[in-house]
């Protein structure tokens, strides 16, 4: 203070001395150090004044401080550490340890002229102020301002003004002293040292400057110079500037200030501190420090760079985008980035880049560069060292020539850099002799020089920054490029290197491990090759931080950028060259599978038929988009400076476009399409010219485009970055309902549109910027669509760093075909109103009006999904065919790439550890198989080929291949062409190929990538089969027979086998996929139900069953035939049954659930597809190769026989099951003689035994688990049936050893459904071997229907399920169990459908389960609950597939009838689960003999693993069962549900949800004899048995099921709540009801909440029909028994309470919001939430559906709670 006092001694009255504050960054120079000497300190006061300040006593000439610091400057801070009242040694130490750079804040006396002399206090206050400011300045400028700026652009202005105000702070002090009317000069001299001045100083905050056009300027109530007395009610007296800034920042958009006018403007008359305003101008070094805070981290940096930067900036626009991208990404990994940035700050080079902020665009060049680095590294880093920034800046300013950039920098930096620069010339010898460090973010440095090399002799040394080599600028080049450039120089060539000595910067770079930093977007799919690698799908963004990982070429170290641009995980990815190679292989390999030649012949053969042609086109369109992007696209995060075009995909995309353009013409305009030039394309489709889009954009409107995915990719390439919205359909029926309501005149096929949507999603989901789940019950999608478009428009976009080739040209005529126009299927619409039009949404080739030429297959085919052509074919066949084609194309052209990319995320998460990259790839291609089945009739070969390609990669077993070959013939779906099919099939046949296919299937089908991944991992094999490949695969595995059988059956029942198969497959796929997929779960259910219905009615379902059945058998048979196949088929078979209890095939042929029943194969296939994947995953865990095989065969098994699929699984691990399966076959044979033989083959006793023996393997797959579940369900009724069937059909299974085709046909029609049920039961039974004994029971049951038996059977299934869960818990079994559990529900579904279809012993039993399930299912369908079932599937896959994902499980307890259970679990581990499935198998074995005991025993283990294991199984099962069966099952089932009620009553049911499942099973067995009603309950519950607690709730529901059915039929009636609904759960031993809330609501809505638990249900007005008083309740439970199946392998953990909502079956006209508290604090980053909901009437865990939370508008994950929109209980 003495200094300040001294300052007051101004000689002239009008002249006053003030203390200016400056912040300077010094760079240590060799021989100079910082070039300053300091004196003073607490222990060394001034000899005269006694001042203890640290004072600059000397500044060396030519040193770093010259021109920046002056003698007598008071040092206020060094590197943010206050130097006030410190000892001299401390100050010296701070300078020494500051390394290469020191940020020094000094106070300098300055004389100013003031109208009135100022009193002494003012200077004092000034000083204090300045000190205050100093403290603030460093902090704020360093961290606060910068980080703020980066975080919010709006803060930029404020921060700038703040910064200015910072320096004014010193001025502020004058305010404090402004009280005296006139400035007065005061001099106080101490007579002795210890004398005090007696002053108490205060500071004021005042308005230093108001920026133009700001809020404050417009308001006019604040003027510059006003003293701020209060900020938002807080008094500012003695408040530091930093605190004031913080207060303002926390104002959250509303700032209240109390200010006092300074009429005399005393404060304003104080000259600006150079610090504040100058820094902003970057006119002074000091200012630089200030600017640094303003612009970003380093004012110095920004200052130095601005000039230079402006120069370089323009050339290198990348920096700016980079800045942006860095900005957001940096936030993600703020920790590492920050530390890195700080280090950088210490180093000039590193710091400079990080310093700049995108927000500081004002500093244009310099700042941009800095920002770029900053963002990359850590925008939060407040201030990199200015000098370093300069050093780094040249790096940033790549565009500018190095010398230019460098020289300006050096001049800016006191010319320190200039003298250190050197120009070295020498001739290259064998090598340049240099090792390089650094990268594009900090500059390229010499890390080592070879002794005696020419470079060493010329004076290059370690630590030199290379600015230029041979006129090539090295300032912004990545390290890998720099190394390659030097390596590529020819020997003997003269090398000219411009370098600069920056050893200190170099050291910092080495210490902080910084170098490269740039962002890339991937355009291919990759499976990590090492534990440290990162797998990725298309469209993912990474920040690359080291392009020469470990000093070797080939790998890059990268950080994955997740949601909200946060950095999620770091790992190794291939370098650019390898990526290009992998991408090219990915694009061509699939083609080889199909083969260009094969395609040519295939399409040529199709020319005669327009329909076929359309199919072929669809095939191609289903393929992933062929992109023009490189494997890695350099991107930056930027705002869209224009209204982005909007592309809408989905079944009602045409309606959405027209509605937007009609209702909001000022915002949206449809881009008109033009006919293509003659000869360009024979297709009738039109094109949209980029010029047309540009005209609309120029009008400030969104251009609505009706284009194909390929066109979207081209738009992205042209940097138009369209907003791509995918309207995700809930179900086929939902699509039909919506289109009837929205566009009744439309002639488009809802089925085709639905299937096309699935294919599109599978192949091109990476193109979607947002997805909206459609609810057929309302038109909420429209508001969500507009909101999504607005949100996307306002979001930052990852855009290409460079310009696209020709993208800038207006006409974009570079590639007339690609850039000058976009294919517009919509335009085709106008020309053709045929069904094919629906494809317009997705594909160019969608129209089939024009003559077909081979050319048509070009890119447009890839774009469009070739489903429309199939419309002509029967529904079942059409779907299959479509899927097949689309899928196939994907596989073929680009299966690995697109499908892989889509599925891979799922793969990636679980599959990396679990499977090989190839496997994953195979999985990725799996979706193609899916399509392939669809296309099967027309282009099955291509589909198969794709599968094959994938298969080749993954499957090991060639044996399956032969079978696969058969598949192409028998099942065109499987293989588009026989040749391709054979090749493909062979590869496919091995477990791995199958695996591959499933992945693809998943990708295409599942909407949520996460879920997809999970599916892949957990049940990739199964998925492949059930999903896409199932049709193909199963056929492939036992292809020749099963396909044939299926085809024959199809032909007999439906249409040509091709069509039927194809259709079936497609349906399956879409449905299955849907179910599995995140949201589609519900929708698929819905569709499946309808589908089944239709199938049943037409009797086609039977054929489907036949086909499927044979497949199933085949699959078993196949496993027997070949070890590879044998093991695989088991997996395969269980998977199909597992999920739906029926093979997926049936369902696909019949897109409707009914079909599923009748044709369990298609329906189950669909479901199973997902399940199988999960199962296969489990299996994979235990034995990678076998699981792969299983996958391959499994999918086939699925396709061949959904029921069988289960059987196969059963067979896999249960000989008994095999026998049991046979009995179902026998019933089938009854329907059809062929069925029996088919069954015999597929279900030979030996395979069953083998399966049983292989139980563990199966269990790992999770398919096994599912099978167990189904077994439990069926054990009572089904097992008896099975016994009968077994007896009759056991021999047929033996026959099954023969080619599956013939035998399959026989059993397929009816037996398949029965078989499905049986299979499920059998599978469960086989798990334990006791089931063998059980099969007789099943047989008996099949002969007669007994509700008790049904209940018992369901109970058994439950117990199996529980057991499985238990087994899963202990080991890898968990995944299997999970899957198995879902299978149970599926089985129930099959049963239900089957029952409906045929009145066999099984049928009754199936009916019982179906009732409970069906009811629930039905409701979900109506309410669009089917999607939740899908989530279940999805969740299940996700569990297996995702290493860590949060699963929020919503469990609607159908049986309970009380409501939904929702739980949140986190998935973490993937591979560990496979082992538990084997355990599960054993429990399953126990189960058949003594279900109750088994259940109990397993129950406890389940409890130990309840969350994970049960969750998985339950999820999948529930999804499948609930959606399809519930919907279909008629009221009779409801009565069945009542028996469930009894079941729930049973204590075991009550206590287990997951464990309870186990309990349930025992309950069933014990209660079945004791109380038929109870058994019935259990049976009904069997599908959802996984959650015992749910079951309890269901007991109440048992009564409710009827209501449910009624409810479905008549919404207006209130659904009664049975007293037991609320009470029973509590009574149950298995779970504890923590809280119960109930209330009566009417049309006005309301809130039902539980304060203790934080759970609440918000019922909006209009959710309940008018005139209805509806009682609603929910119970919050803590019960392992009813927990959703958590996938331990995925590391799922329950994060939220389990909530059971009721009454079950209640549907809302508007979605109600269920809020669940959760503890997933890490959710936003690496964790993934999965919502698991059970819609089963029984509340079975098996019916847990996975609902996708991320990105789903129906689910909102907050910091402490998850909000879920549900439309039914």
Curated annotation (Swiss-Prot):
Comp. bias (Basic residues): 102-112
Location within or outside the cell? Cell membrane; Cell junction, Tight junction; Cell junction; Cell junction, Gap junction
Q: Which residues carry this modification: Phosphotyrosine?
A: 131, 821, 1139, 1164, 1353
A Pfam entry, by short name? Guanylate_kin
The UniProt annotation puts the region (Occludin (OCLN)-binding region) at 632-875
Keywords noted in UniProt: Calmodulin-binding, Cell junction, Cell membrane, Gap junction, Membrane, Phosphoprotein, Repeat, SH3 domain, Tight junction
Record-annotated membrane-spanning stretches: none
Give the domain note. Answer: The 244-aa domain between residues 633 and 876 is the primary occludin (OCLN)-binding site and is required for stable association with the tight junction.
Name of this chain's protein: Tight junction protein 1
Give every PDZ domain span. Answer: 23-110, 185-263, 420-501
Q: Where is the composition biased (Acidic residues)?
A: 123-135
| Comp. bias intervals (Polar residues) | 933-952, 962-976, 1387-1401, 1460-1471, 1514-1523
């Amino acid at each position: 203070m003495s200094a300040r006092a001294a300052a007051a001694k101004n000689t002239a009255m009008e002249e006053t001395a003030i203390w200016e504050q400056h912040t300077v960054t010094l760079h240590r120079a060799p021989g100079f150090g910082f070039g300053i000497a300091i004196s003073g300190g607490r222990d060394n006061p001034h000899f005269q004044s006694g001042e203890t300040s640290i004072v600059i006593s000397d500044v060396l000439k030519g040193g770093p401080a010259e021109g920046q610091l002056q003698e007598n400057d008071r040092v206020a801070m060094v590197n943010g550490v206050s130097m006030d009242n410190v000892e001299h040694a401390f100050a010296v130490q701070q300078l020494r340890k500051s390394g290469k750079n020191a940020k020094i804040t000094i106070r300098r006396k300055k004389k100013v002229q003031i109208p009135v002399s100022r009193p002494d206090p003012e200077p004092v206050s000034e000083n204090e102020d300045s000190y205050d400011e100093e403290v603030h300045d460093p902090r704020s400028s360093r961290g606060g301002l910068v980080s703020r700026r980066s975080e919010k652009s709006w803060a930029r202005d404020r921060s700038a003004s703040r910064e200015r105000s910072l320096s004014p702070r010193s001025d502020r002090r004058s305010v404090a002293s402004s009280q005296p009317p006139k400035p007065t000069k005061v001099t106080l001299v101490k007579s002795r040292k210890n004398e005090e001045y007696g002053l108490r100083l205060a500071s004021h905050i005042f308005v230093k400057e108001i920026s133009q056009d700001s809020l404050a300027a417009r308001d006019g109530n604040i003027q510059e110079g006003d003293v701020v007395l209060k900020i938002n009610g807080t008094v500012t007296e003695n408040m530091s500037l930093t605190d004031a800034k913080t207060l303002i920042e926390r104002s959250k958009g509303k700032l209240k200030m109390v200010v006092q006018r300074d009429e005399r403007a005393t404060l304003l008359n104080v000259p600006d501190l150079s610090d504040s305003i100058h820094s902003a101008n970057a006119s002074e070094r000091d200012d630089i420090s200030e600017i640094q805070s303003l612009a970003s981290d380093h004012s110095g940096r920004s200052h130095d760079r601005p000039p230079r930067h402006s120069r370089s900036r323009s050339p290198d626009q990348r920096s700016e985008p980079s800045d942006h991208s860095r900005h957001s990404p940096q936030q993600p990994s703020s920790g590492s980035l920050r530390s890195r940035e700080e280090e950088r700050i210490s180093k000039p080079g590193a710091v400079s880049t990080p310093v700049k902020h995108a927000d500081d665009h004002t500093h244009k060049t310099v700042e941009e560069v800095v920002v770029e680095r900053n963002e990359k590294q850590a925008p939060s880093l407040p201030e990199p060292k200015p000098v370093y920034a300069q050093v780094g800046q040249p790096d940033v300013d790549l565009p500018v020539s190095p010398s230019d950039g460098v020289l300006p920098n050096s001049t800016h930096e006191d010319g320190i850099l200039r003298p250190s620069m050197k120009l070295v010339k020498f001739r290259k010898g064998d090598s340049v002799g240099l090792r390089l460090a650094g990268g594009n973010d900090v500059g390229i440095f010499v890390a080592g020089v070879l002794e005696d090399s020419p470079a060493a002799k010329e004076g290059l040394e370690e630590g030199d920054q290379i600015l230029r080599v041979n006129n090539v600028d090295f300032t912004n080049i990545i390290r890998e490029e720099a190394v390659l450039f030097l390596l590529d120089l020819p020997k003997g060539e003269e090398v000219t290197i411009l370098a600069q000595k920056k050893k200190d910067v170099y050291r910092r770079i080495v210490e902080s491990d910084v170098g490269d930093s740039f962002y890339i977007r991937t355009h291919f799919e990759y499976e990590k090759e090492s534990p440290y690698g990162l797998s990725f799908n298309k469209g993912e963004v990474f920040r690359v931080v080291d392009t020469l990982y470990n000093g070797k070429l080939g790998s890059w170290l990268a950080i994955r950028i997740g949601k909200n641009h946060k950095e999620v995980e770091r790992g190794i990815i291939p370098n650019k060259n390898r990526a290009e190679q992998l991408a090219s292989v990915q694009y061509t390999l699939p083609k080889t599978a199909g083969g260009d030649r094969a395609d040519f012949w295939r399409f040529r053969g199709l020319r005669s038929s327009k329909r076929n042609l359309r199919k072929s086109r669809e095939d191609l369109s289903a393929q992933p988009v062929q992109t023009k992007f490189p494997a890695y696209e350099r991107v930056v995060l930027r705002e869209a400076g224009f209204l982005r075009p909007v592309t809408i995909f989905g079944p009602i995309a045409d309606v959405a476009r027209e509605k937007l353009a009609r209702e909001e013409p000022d915002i949206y305009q449809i881009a008109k399409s033009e006919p293509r030039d003659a000869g360009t394309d024979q297709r009738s489709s039109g094109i949209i010219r980029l010029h047309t889009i540009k005209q609309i954009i120029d009008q400030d409107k969104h251009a609505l485009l009706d284009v194909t995915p390929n066109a979207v990719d081209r738009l992205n390439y042209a940097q138009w970055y369209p907003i791509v919205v995918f309207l995700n359909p809930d179900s086929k029926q939902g699509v039909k309902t919506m289109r009837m309501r929205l566009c009744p005149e439309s002639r488009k096929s809802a089925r085709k549109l639905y299937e096309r949507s699935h294919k599109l999603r599978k192949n091109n989901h990476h193109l979607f910027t947002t997805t909206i789940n459609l609810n057929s019950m309302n038109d909420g999608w429209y508001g969500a669509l507009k909101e999504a478009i607005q949100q996307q428009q306002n979001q930052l976009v990852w855009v290409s760093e460079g310009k696209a080739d020709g993208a800038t040209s207006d006409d974009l005529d570079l590639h007339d075909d690609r850039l000058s126009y976009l294919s517009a299927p919509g335009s085709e619409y106008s020309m053709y109103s045929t069904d094919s039009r629906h494809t317009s949404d997705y594909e160019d080739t969608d129209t089939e009006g024009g003559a077909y030429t081979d050319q048509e297959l070009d890119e447009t085919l890839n774009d469009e999904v070739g489903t429309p052509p199939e419309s002509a074919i029967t529904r079942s066949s059409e779907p299959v065919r479509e899927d097949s084609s689309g899928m196939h194309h994907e596989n073929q052209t680009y299966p690995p790439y697109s499908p892989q990319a889509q599925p891979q995320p799922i793969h990636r998460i679980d599959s990396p550890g679990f499977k090989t990259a190839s496997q994953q790839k195979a999985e990725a291609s799996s979706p193609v198989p899916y399509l392939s089945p669809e296309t099967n009739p027309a282009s099955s070969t291509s589909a198969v080929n794709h599968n094959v390609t994938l298969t080749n990669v993954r499957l090991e077993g060639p044996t399956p291949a032969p079978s696969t070959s058969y598949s192409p013939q028998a099942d065109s779906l499987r293989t588009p062409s026989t040749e391709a099919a054979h090749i493909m099939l062979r590869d496919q046949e091995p477990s791995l190929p199958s695996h591959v296919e499933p992945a693809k299937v998943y990708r295409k089908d599942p909407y949520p990538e996460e879920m997809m991944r999970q599916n892949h991992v957990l049940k990739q094999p199964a998925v492949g089969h059930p999903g896409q490949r199932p049709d193909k695969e199963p056929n492939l595995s036992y292809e020749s027979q099963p396909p044939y059988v299926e085809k024959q059956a199809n032909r007999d029942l439906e249409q040509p086998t091709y069509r039927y198969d194809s259709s079936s497959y497609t349906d399956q796929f879409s449905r299955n996929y849907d179910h599995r997929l995140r949201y589609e779960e519900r929708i698929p259910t819905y569709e499946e139900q309808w589908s089944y219905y239709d199938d049943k009615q037409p009797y086609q379902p039977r054929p489907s069953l036949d086909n499927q059945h044979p497949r199933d058998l085949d699959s078993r048979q196949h496993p027997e035939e070949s070890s590879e196949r044998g093991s695989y088929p088991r997996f395969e078979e269980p998977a199909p049954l597992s999920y739906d209890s029926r093979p997926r095939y049936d369902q696909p042929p019949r897109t409707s659930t009914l079909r599923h029943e009748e044709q369990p194969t298609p329906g189950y296939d669909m479901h199973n597809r997902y399940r199988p994947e999960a199962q296969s995953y489990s299996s994979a865990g235990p034995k990678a190769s076998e699981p792969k095989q299983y996958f391959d065969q499994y999918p086939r098994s699925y396709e061949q026989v959904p029921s069988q699929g289960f059987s196969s699984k059963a067979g896999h691990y249960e000989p008994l099951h095999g026998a049991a399966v046979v009995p179902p076959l026998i019933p089938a044979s009854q329907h059809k003689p062929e069925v029996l033989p088919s069954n015999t083959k597929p279900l030979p006793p030996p395979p069953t035994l083998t399966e049983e023996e292989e139980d563990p393997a199966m269990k790992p797959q999770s398919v096994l688990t599912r099978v167990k579940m189904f077994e439990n369900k069926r054990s009572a009724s089904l097992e008896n049936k099975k016994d009968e069937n077994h007896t009759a059909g056991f021999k047929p299974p033996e026959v099954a050893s023969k080619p599956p085709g013939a035998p399959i046909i026989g059993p397929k029609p009816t037996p398949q459904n029965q078989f499905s049920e049986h299979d499920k039961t059998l599978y469960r039974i086989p798990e334990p071997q006791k089931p063998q004994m059980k099969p007789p029971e099943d047989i008996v049951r099949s002969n007669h229907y007994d509700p008790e038996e049904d209940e018992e059977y369901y109970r058994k299934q439950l117990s199996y399920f529980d057991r499985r869960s238990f087994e899963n818990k202990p080991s890898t079994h968990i995944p299997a169990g999970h899957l198995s559990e879902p299978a149970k529900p599926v089985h129930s579904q099959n049963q239900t459908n089957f029952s409906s279809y045929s009145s066999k012993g099984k049928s009754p039993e199936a009916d019982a389960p179906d009732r409970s399930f069906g009811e629930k299912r039905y409701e979900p369908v109506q309410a669009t609950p089917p999607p939740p079932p899908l989530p279940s599937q999805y969740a299940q896959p996700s569990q297996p597939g995702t290493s860590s994902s949060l699963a929020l499980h919503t469990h609607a307890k159908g049986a309970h009838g009380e409501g939904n259970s929702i739980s949140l679990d986190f998935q973490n581990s993937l591979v560990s689960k496979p082992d538990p499935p084997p355990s599960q198998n054993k429990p399953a074995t126990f189960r058949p003999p003594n279900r109750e005991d088994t259940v109990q025993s397993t129950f406890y283990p389940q409890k130990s693993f309840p969350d994970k294991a049960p969750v998985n199984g339950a999820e999948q099962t529930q999804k499948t069962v609930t959606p399809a069966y519930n919907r279909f099952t008629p009221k009779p089932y409801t009565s069945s549900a009542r028996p469930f009620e009894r079941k729930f009553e049973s204590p075991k049911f009550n206590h287990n949800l997951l464990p309870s499942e186990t309990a349930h099973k025992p309950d069933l067995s014990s209660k079945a004899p004791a109380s038929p009603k109870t058994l019935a309950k259990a049976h009904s519950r069997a599908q959802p048995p996984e959650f015992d607690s749910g079951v309890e709730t269901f007991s109440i529901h048992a009564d409710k099921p009827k209501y449910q059915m009624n409810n479905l039929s008549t919404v207006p009636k209130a659904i009664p709540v049975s007293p037991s609904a609320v009470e029973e759960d509590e009574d149950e031993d298995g779970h504890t009801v923590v809280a119960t809330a109930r209330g009566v609501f009417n049309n006005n809505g309301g809130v039902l909440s539980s304060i203790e638990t934080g759970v609440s249900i918000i019922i909006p007005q209009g959710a309940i029909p008018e005139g209805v008083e509806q009682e609603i309740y929910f119970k919050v439970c803590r019960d392992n028994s009813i927990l959703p199946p958590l996938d331990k392998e995925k590391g799922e953990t329950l994060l939220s309470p389990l909530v059971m909502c009721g009454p079950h079956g209640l549907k809302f006209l508007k979605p109600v919001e269920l809020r669940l508290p959760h503890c997933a604090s890490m959710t936003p980053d690496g964790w993934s939430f999965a919502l698991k909901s059970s819609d089963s009437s029984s509340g079975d865990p098996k019916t847990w559906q996975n609902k996708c939370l991320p990105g789903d508008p129906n689910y909102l994950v907050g910091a402490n709670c998850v909000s879920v929109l549900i439309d039914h209980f």
